Curated annotation (Swiss-Prot):
Region (Disordered): 1-40, 321-348, 411-436, 529-550, 1059-1089, 1107-1191
Main subcellular location of this protein, as a coarse class: nucleus
InterPro entries associated with the record: Timeless, Timeless_N
GO annotation, biological process: DNA repair; DNA replication checkpoint signaling; meiotic cell cycle; replication fork arrest
Biased composition (Low complexity): 330-348
Protein's recorded name: Topoisomerase 1-associated factor 1
Polar residues bias (residue ranges): 1141-1159, 1168-1178
Biased composition (Basic and acidic residues): 26-37
Organism: Mycosarcoma maydis
A Pfam entry, by short name: TIMELESS
Amino acid sequence: MATKDDYSEDLENDADLMTDFSDDEYGYRHEEGHNDEEAAPNIEEIREAAADLCNQIGEYDYGDEHDWDGEQYPRLKRWKHRPRALGSLRSLRKLWKMDDDDPTRKVARAFAENEVLQHTILPALLESAGQGKEGDAIALACTDLLTAMTWPFDGLEELREQEKQGHLDLAELSEITLLDEHLVNYKSVILRNRSLDQQHDVLGVVMRYLLLPNLATKHHERSTLATGIISMCLHLFRNLLAIRDPVTTSLSSVERLSNANLQSELILSMHKHHILDALLMLSSSAETQAYNAWNAVASECIFHIFVGTMVKTIAEPTFSGSGTRMSHDSTPNASASNTAGSSSNANAGPISSLAESLAMETKLKRASASGKIATRHSRFGTTINFVGPDGELRVARNQAALIKPVAQLADEANQKGRRRAQRRKDAQEKGAPKLKSKWTPDAALVLQEWADTFVQSGFEPLAKSVLKDIRSERDKLGDLDVARVRIMQLGAFFLEYFLLRRTTAAKRRNAAKTAGSVQSTFAQRALDLQEPDEQHERSGQSAEQPEEAEEWPFELVSQWLEPWAFRMVLVRTIQSQETKAWLEFVASVRLWIVLLRLVDELANSKKESERDVAEGLQAEFYYMGETLEACHAIFRSYTTQSFAFLDAIIAFAYVMPKMLERYASNRDHMYVQAKKQVHRSRQDGDLDTDQDEARQIKEQLQETRSEREFRFADFQRKLATKQLAKACIVYLRRWKDNNGTEDQLNELVTVMHRIAIKANDYRQFFLATHRDYLRFMISGDTISAFEARAPTSAPNLRKLIDYILRKFSKLSPEEQSIYNAGKQPTRQPKPPRMPAEIVVRPGMTPDQEIGVAVGLLLKKEKMPAVLWIKSALEMASAMRTELVLRYEEEEAQRSIQGAGDDMMLLGELEKHNESPVERFQPYELAYHGNDELRTDASLMPELKLLCRLVGLEANDNELVNWRWSVPKEILPVHLDQKIETIERYIREPLDTHGRELTALVMRIRKPRVAGEADADVLDPADLPDGWNGAQSDSDEDGDYFDRIRASRSLVSADHVAAEGGLLRRSGPKKKLSHPTKGDGSRKKKQIQRIKQDIIDDSDDEFAFALADLQPQARTDADADSSSDDKEEEDDDDDNMDDQETPATSSVADLQEQFDQGKSNALDALRTAKQQRSNTEQPPLQDAGERINRRMDTKRLFLADSDEDDDDVLALSSQEPADISATSDRTATGPSVWAGIAKKRRLAILDDEDED
């Protein structure tokens, strides 16, 4: 993470390191203006300069000769440094910096050839430390140079980088690959060199004389030099840990074999000199200000120790052979089962000799079949000519062809012709840590003890501080992408380590309980034989023993059991997949898997509080809609990546669905967030400057994310993709070559079973390439090798392959031919469905909502549809206006005619009290054979929105043949208002203040009803030609970006009812029910109420009628006061009309007679008025004269509006209009119209008083 000069800049400020030694003496100091290639020294000059500088540092002082096996040898007495030792070391350091701009690394190669580190730097460091101030300064300079020379270096990667940059000197560039071997030699010399007195080694000197004195200094007393020294020493440890051990074989040299376990030797040396304890202290104190500066380098050291090693090799170390120490935490069963065999590969685990023999036999057979095995040539050769089944002449050139049938030879020839050159598959992603060699038993035990302490005290503080620095983008971390990947890999390793140690402790505890129960049985038997007093004492002692505390509680990793950890892996997975940063992708998926396993273990805890925490974590994580989408993206992500990538995909496909299925199975209903489609302008964060800011904030607050019901069967069906099936087949091919474990094969078989059996999508494995390999596995010896290495999972794999091949054999020949061609049968296209309807967003007036709908239709060039609605409203308004005027004519005629007998008067009264609204009929909009208009009215959301906004009702019994109609409850005056609104927005579109019309509406889905999953599926035969199911922008490009679950009617008509235009809501037409007894009583009640209103309209007119026409009725008028109380009781008991009618009493009969007489008198009064008025009957009014309709409609509306108090209260504001309309009618019939106006005015005032 850090660079080479981060700590050396602090060291250069020390006066002890400054010297008057001049670099110009050798002429290798870079000056300004002398950076040309001609001035650059060659490797010979650098080698000579390095040798001279080494001579200036010092040398061993040889003493007297001593006898060794009869020969005389000089004896090393002591190290003697020269006067210019410090200057020479500093000059070597500057000479080393020349490699910063040299791609061929001449200085590094010259130092390695001169063995500067072995013969000069290490002796000076070992013999000068602790020898006063000058000796400590020399030791500090040597450590500085030692750190620079051991800096991590990847020769192959450097070579590729230089080739990309265009350096053509490949002869010199190829030399830098040898620097990796030099680093291994440096590590070996550093670990094995000791001082002359054999009391000091390099790590001990650095720790004792450099690191500890400066690390023990208090924070406020620590100088810049001390900080640099601490950083330098830690970087030296990091460099040594980063140097990997060489890969050895049986043919490797002795030197290479001796260096095969350098990492284990380094761990033991660091443990001996308490360097591991220092790293543990820095980790546990990483959040403190005193030690936070070195959290990055400490995490790097821990990363290079553990990452790249299988967790089981540290958490559950098992060693074979006698004399090796076993782990004190490993169970006897585990150790006995894992000591059956060993292998040179540390990560493959123990493999039996039978498995190795079968693998070798399979390899030999494969080589023999391909003709690559060495054979003994006969004197006549091995070329065979044969004619294949297709009639072509072919040639076979191996001896095995002598005993093979022609069909098999032809098949092999065809396979060889189709064989393509495949590039070598990588085992790891580029930049991933290399796999470490096998740890020695002592080193593994040391690492286990240290890892236990680290998880308990240092893991969480270190991870928390490093993640905080990554968010703050600290410079000490270097490349942030690399730091982020490493901390995720470190977290995944130690979380998995925690799980394994917890499982091991639980097994050991259960075994102890089992053994304890057996011992307690014998103890109880012995206790029964003792005296009663002794029994009481023993039982008391056993009761006082406390319960054993949990060894690995979840509190140790509580930081990772928080929502931020899941959000982090989710975000990093999505971003790394978009940028194709596969190393980070693998690290985040691996951490995700371990977190899921950790939550699963937490959910199975015995403590209820821990189970509640796991429940909350899963509920919050699964509820996020991005989680399930990211899971499906992971399942489809494999193409040609490495085996590590493939292993992560298969492991995730094994763990994630398993946990999700278990979580969903415990719930009747599970809801997750639906995908939210945000408009582009809102994604960019733009706000409309012309629009009111408060209104925009209100709209943003009203936007909520919708929910949808989650079904695991749908999730599992989407999991079965061709990408995941391909990943399974490729993983199956590469599992044996990469020394996979049985657990990995078990995960693979489970994933394949989920695809083929549970998701019922076995056709994903029917492709020719997949099927051929499955048949090759089951027919050859490959499955036998699998069974030897995985005796539990391989039989299940065999059964699954048999099942898939049997399913393919049952296909028709036509389908088999399609799969043999490498294609899949085309799936039937999904049937078209009813497009989702839309509504206008809240916050707009009713007129503006109509303007939005008109604008959307005009934008889609649907002007004929708008005019179709407008003309229908005009026709319905004209027809209803005519009915109102005809009613007025009939009323005028009845007022002129004389009064008849009582029975005739009663019939005329009922006809007279009939409301014009009752004569209205629903007006159905006709399509006139226009199929396009019929389809748009049934399927287009914009057109249906306009229909609902103007109050139309729909009969949606047929999906593609909706019948729209104008309800009979809408009065002509309100129809005219809708017509005027449509005309206004056709002339002048709605001003949206710069916003798109599509941003003002939102889609709305009807709630799902059980058993109606296919209720909105359209029949393609009913659709016109050219209709592709995308009739609306809402289904094309997601302009209506907000979907909500419908919990109310599609269009709320509360604003229409508030205007008094509708007597009920306008919405989807309800199903007609059969008339009941309650409906008849309600109608009868309405008629009686109309009669009573007319009777009680005017007491003055009633008195006039009694005085002028029927004097004998005056005696009956005296009973009026006695019937007032009874009339009030009748008005208060209107709610009893739906119940059974009680028997009439004498008082009720008297009231009926009085009302009948009053009605007769009122009819006689009207007859007299008609006789006195000899005016002409007013002509039928034109539909354009709409002002004359107001008074009549108000009066008629008043007669039917008792059930809606809100509508009645709205009439007081409309009274002046009624009076003005009445004044226009006095010209034709002043007395008639004056009387009617007076009656209506009194009726309105009476109703207001009652309210």
